[in-house]
Structures are given as structure tokens and as C-alpha cells.
UniProtKB/Swiss-Prot annotation:
SUPFAM superfamilies xrefs: S-adenosyl-L-methionine-dependent methyltransferases (SSF53335)
Domain of life the protein comes from: Bacteria
Native organism: Mycobacterium marinum (strain ATCC BAA-535 / M)
Protein name: Uncharacterized methyltransferase MMAR_0473
Keywords associated with the record: Methyltransferase, Transferase
Family per similarity comment: Belongs to the methyltransferase superfamily.
InterPro entries: Methyltransf_11, SAM-dependent_MTases_sf
Catalytic activity, EC: 2.1.1.-
Record-level Gene Ontology MF annotations: S-adenosylmethionine-dependent methyltransferase activity
Length: 255
């Protein structure tokens, strides 16, 4: 069984449309948006683990790099996973307020590019929509592989710059260029975007991610995170994937 076989059966058009409908709530109602994304991500990781290892993910330890305020912790706890979140920004760690205070999992304030964990210390290392927010995404990826046990899974998912969501709250203006889009947003809103090009948002391509992952010798799957299964072929087509694979998932298994 291929590592993606189980999840591929869930990757339907209705799922894609349901998740797409939640994106408009990312800023006005983050609990709704991230709650839906967290549940879907926990299912994704559970399916990948079961297909790869032939056993339930329950009882395993997962390190979430860039875990934010803990929305994902609840979803993984419900799956029986031991959750550890890593987040460098104290504002992000407390963004959910009292709703997640004292919730499941444990949290560490640290950078994903220098994880304070021993080699081979977790079963699964996840990074969801973080790589495009750091200046050295493949250093983050290397750290994820370092802390993942042989036979475990490192799952790195990120927003592709030239896809329709690459500009985040700047909208499609990122097609004019990142710096120009950032300046335009600041003029219109009177303040920089939260995801500000050049400081908290960077242009990361699908080709870069695939090249890095293949170079590690540990890549076992790559597919568009939010697309239905019948559209996964786009990942294999240069240039097309940059515009139509809005979010790329890289699944790696250290040996």
C-alpha cells in the first residue's frame, strides 16, 4: 500500500469545497478556521501513519513545528496522539485566549530552524503552513528530519508562492511582486500585513520543495493538500504546479 492510499479516498471534491469555504474565516474567526483545518490535518496524519506503518497513530508522539495557540493539539489529542507544539512567537502561542488555556498537549517556545529536541526523539514531525513564513525553509525541514525517528514520518506542508493563496491577506496582488503587494497593502490598510513579504512571508516554490525533499533521499510522497485525488497529477507538471498546487505536502520517512 502506498502511503497516500488511505487519505486519497478522503480527498474528494466535497472535502476541497468544504475546506475552501472555511478560508474566509481565517482572520475574523480563527477558531472556526483552524478548528476545521486541525481536524482535517489530524485525519491526514492518521491516514498516512496507518498506511505507512500498518497500525494506529494512537500512542505516538507528534511534534508540531509552528503549532501556534493549540488548535491542532485538541484534534490530535482526540486521535490519542501525544502532542508537543513548538512556536517562536509568544503572541501566537496565546492567540486563542482562554479557550485553549490548560488544554491538551505541551508547548515549547522555540524556533523551528533550531529545534531543542534530541535526534530521533519523536515518531511524527509536522509543519503545517509554516515554511513560507521563515527565511530558511529547508533548514526547518532538515531539523524536522533530524528529530524524527527512523521509520517515522516528517510531514511538511506549505503554501506555494505563485498559487492563488500565496499572497495570504494581500490577495492576488502578490502576482505584481511581493514587495509591491506589501506596499500596496500597507497603503490601503494603514499598517503592514500580518504576513508581510520579506519579513514574515517569503516566496517558496513547489520546485524548491520537491528538489530539497528528493535530495534528502527520504521523500515517499508529494501531493496537493487541498485538491481532490483526481487533481494530484498537477504536482508532477513543472510550472503548472507553481500556479495550481496551492499547498504542497511533502511526506518523508527517515531511515
Amino acid at each position: 500500500m502506498a502511503v497516500t492510499d488511505r487519505f486519497a479516498r478522503r480527498a474528494t471534491l466535497s472535502r476541497s469545497l468544504r475546506l475552501l469555504s472555511e478560508f474566509r474565516y481565517e482572520q475574523p474567526d480563527p477558531a472556526r478556521f483552524y478548528g476545521a483545518l486541525a481536524a482535517d490535518t489530524a485525519t491526514l496524519v492518521s491516514d498516512l501513519w496507518l498506511a505507512a506503518r500498518g497500525e494506529s497513530v494512537a500512542g505516538r508522539t507528534l511534534l508540531d513545528v509552528g503549532g501556534g495557540p493549540g488548535y491542532f493539539a485538541s484534534a490530535f489529542a482526540a486521535a490519542g496522539v501525544g502532542y508537543i507544539g513548538v512556536e517562536p512567537d509568544p503572541n501566537e502561542m496565546h492567540a486563542a485566549g482562554p479557550a485553549h488555556a490548560g488544554g491538551p498537549g505541551s508547548f515549547v517556545r522555540a524556533s523551528g530552524m533550531a529545534l531543542p529536541f534530541a535526534d530521533d526523539s519523536v515518531d511524527i514531525c509536522l509543519s503545517s503552513n509554516v515554511a513560507e513564513h521563515v527565511p530558511r525553509p529547508w533548514q526547518l525541514g532538515a531539523e524536522m528530519l533530524r528529530v524524527t525517528r527512523p521509520g517515522g514520518l516528517a510531514v511538511l506542508s506549505y503554501t506555494v508562492w505563485l498559487g492563488p493563496f500565496g499572497g495570504h491577506e494581500m490577495g492576488l496582488s502578490h502576482y505584481l511582486g511581493g514587495a509591491r503587494a506589501a506596499a500596496r497593502y500597507a497603503r490601503r490598510h494603514g499598517h503592514p500585513a500580518k504576513n508581510n513579504y520579506g519579513s514574515s512571508l517569503f516566496a517558496v516554490s513547489a520546485a524548491e520543495g520537491l528538489r530539497w525533499a528528493e535530495g534528502t533521499g527520504t521523500l515517499i510522497a508529494a501531493f496537493p493538500r487541498y485538491h481532490p485525488r483526481w487533481a494530484w497529477w498537477m504536482t508532477s507538471v513543472p510550472m503548472l504546479r507553481e500556479f495550481l498546487v496551492s499547498n504542497l505536502v511533502l511526506v518523508l520517512s527517515p531511515r
